[in-house]
């Protein structure tokens, strides 16, 4: 085995693809059923009304409606989707 690197050899050049995590839909926006709301690692944001948690902690909408981010207790957050008809009636 040579103790010196040969000319032009490089031990770098590997990289992984980005994960594209974060909030995909913000509060007040309208979504359709199945829309991804948040991509995350662990439950940084919890699932609220009409929102389900995927096996990779992705939060997605179950119904068509308007997104609302709310507090869950003192130090947690949750995201809910309220049907658009109910949202207009309360406004």
Swiss-Prot record:
Residues 1-22 are annotated as: Disordered. It comes from the Bacteria. GO terms for molecular function: structural constituent of ribosome. GO terms for biological process: translation. This is Large ribosomal subunit protein bL27. The keyword Acetylation does not apply. It comes from Myxococcus xanthus (strain DK1622). GO terms for cellular component: cytosolic large ribosomal subunit. Pfam families: Ribosomal_L27. Belongs to the bacterial ribosomal protein bL27 family.
């Amino acid at each position: 085995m040579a103790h010196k690197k040969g000319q032009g050899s490089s031990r770098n050049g590997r990289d992984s693809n980005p994960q594209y995590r974060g909030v995909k839909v913000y509060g007040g926006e309208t979504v359709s059923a199945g829309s991804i709301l948040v991509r995350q690692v662990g439950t940084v944001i919890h699932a609220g009304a009409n929102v389900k948690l995927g096996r990779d902690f992705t939060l997605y909408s179950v119904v068509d409606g308007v997104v609302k981010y709310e507090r869950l207790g003192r130090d947690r957050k949750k995201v809910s989707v309220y049907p658009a008809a109910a949202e207009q009636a309360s406004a």
